[in-house]
Amino acid sequence: MNKNYSYPLDLSWSTEELASVLSFFNNVEAAYEQKVQAEKLLKSYEAFKQVVPSKGQEKRIGREFENVSGYSLYHAVQEAKSKGKGSISLGK
C-alpha cells in the first residue's frame, strides 16, 4: 500500500486530541503491517472515542482512512475485541 498518504484529521482538534487519533491510526497500521497488542489497540481506540464520540463521524473517518491506507479501523478493533489479550496481526 502507498506509504505516502494523509490521515483524515480535523484541524480543530487540540494537540492532545490529534496525538490520540494518530496513536490509534498508528496502532491500526501496526496490526496490518506487523503485530500489535490487542490491549494497546483497544486503549488507543478508547482515547480515539473521546475525541470522536459520534458513531457517524467515526464511520466517516474510518472510510477515509481505509480509502487512503487500505486498513480498516473497524476490522482491527473487532479483531482486538475478540482476541482480548495478546498480539493481533491482520497482515496477509
Curated annotation (Swiss-Prot):
Pfam families for the chain: UPF0223
Family: Belongs to the UPF0223 family.
Protein name in the entry: UPF0223 protein SSA_0938
